[in-house]
């Protein structure tokens, strides 16, 4: 926690200072290169000149957690990789944010097994969920815009990690994924043949 956040109490109004700090934070979110599976290919594609991620101030991908603000978890998180993800998150300085990119990072994707973590939010707090399998670069940019909107509403009187998204968004996303997964495994019983008078066999 920084000196400024320690100095003021929660009932102290910092509207003008909040505006300046939030503007600086949202305009220079530095993501960390943390690709785990196929979603990382789309994350790398988003950093090319065709998509121009510099518009959002996120063109500086940092290889070190100590120099980054945003951890984009792109891909499947296995149980062996989970402690590494948690440790890297703890090494990031405040303020820090987490984006779950793709179905695997959000809810485990199609890998509903004992070896796969069913959502990275079980080990680190997630701010934005980017849907898709894998998500296109446009989806990643939409997630960055949502993160910038969230940063706009932060205040120095509260630690950034204390302000998290409502869990209803994740619950709705998980429910839709489970319905889609259950729909692919439903056994459809053959329909009974129609009864036509005079054609019944004994």
UniProtKB/Swiss-Prot annotation:
Topology within the bilayer: Peripheral membrane protein
InterPro entries: NADH_UbQ_OxRdtase-like_20kDa, NADH_UQ_OxRdtase_20Kd_su
Domain of life: Bacteria
A single GO molecular function term of this UniProt record: 4 iron, 4 sulfur cluster binding
Binding site for [4Fe-4S] cluster: 38-39, 104, 133
Catalytic activity: a quinone + NADH + 5 H(+)(in) = a quinol + NAD(+) + 4 H(+)(out)
Keywords, in A-Z order: 4Fe-4S, Cell inner membrane, Cell membrane, Iron, Iron-sulfur, Membrane, Metal-binding, NAD, Quinone, Translocase, Transport, Ubiquinone
Gene Ontology biological process terms from the UniProt entry: aerobic respiration; electron transport coupled proton transport
Subcellular location: Cell inner membrane
Cofactor(s) listed in the protein's UniProt record: [4Fe-4S] cluster
EC id: 7.1.1.-
Function description: NDH-1 shuttles electrons from NADH, via FMN and iron-sulfur (Fe-S) centers, to quinones in the respiratory chain. The immediate electron acceptor for the enzyme in this species is believed to be ubiquinone. Couples the redox reaction to proton translocation (for every two electrons transferred, four hydrogen ions are translocated across the cytoplasmic membrane), and thus conserves the redox energy in a proton gradient.
Family: Belongs to the complex I 20 kDa subunit family.
PANTHER family tied to this protein: NADH DEHYDROGENASE, NADH DEHYDROGENASE [UBIQUINONE] IRON-SULFUR PROTEIN 7, MITOCHONDRIAL
Assembly and oligomerization: NDH-1 is composed of 14 different subunits. Subunits NuoB, C, D, E, F, and G constitute the peripheral sector of the complex.
The protein's name in its UniProt record: NADH-quinone oxidoreductase subunit B 2
Gene: nuoB2
């Amino acid at each position: 926690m920084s000196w400024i956040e320690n100095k003021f109490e929660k009932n102290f109004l910092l509207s003008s200072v909040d505006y300046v700090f939030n503007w600086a934070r949202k305009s220079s979110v530095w993501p960390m290169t943390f690709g785990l599976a196929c979603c990382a290919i789309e994350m790398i594609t988003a950093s090319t000149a065709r998509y121009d991620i510099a518009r959002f101030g996120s063109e500086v991908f940092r290889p070190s957690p100590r120099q980054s603000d945003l951890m984009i978890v792109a891909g499947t998180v296995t149980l062996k990789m989970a402690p590494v993800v948690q440790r890297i998150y703890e090494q990031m300085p405040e303020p820090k944010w987490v984006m779950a990119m793709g179905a695997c990072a959000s809810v485990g994707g199609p890998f509903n097994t004992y070896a796969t973590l069913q959502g990275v939010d079980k080990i680190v707090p997630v701010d934005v969920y980017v849907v898709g399998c894998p998500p296109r670069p446009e989806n990643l940019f939409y997630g960055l815009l949502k993160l910038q909107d969230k940063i706009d509403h932060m205040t120095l009187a509260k630690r950034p990690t204390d302000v998290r998204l409502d869990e209803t968004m994740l619950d709705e996303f998980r429910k839709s994924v489970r319905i889609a997964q259950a729909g692919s495994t439903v056994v459809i019983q053959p329909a009974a043949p129609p009864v036509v008078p005079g054609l019944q066999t004994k």
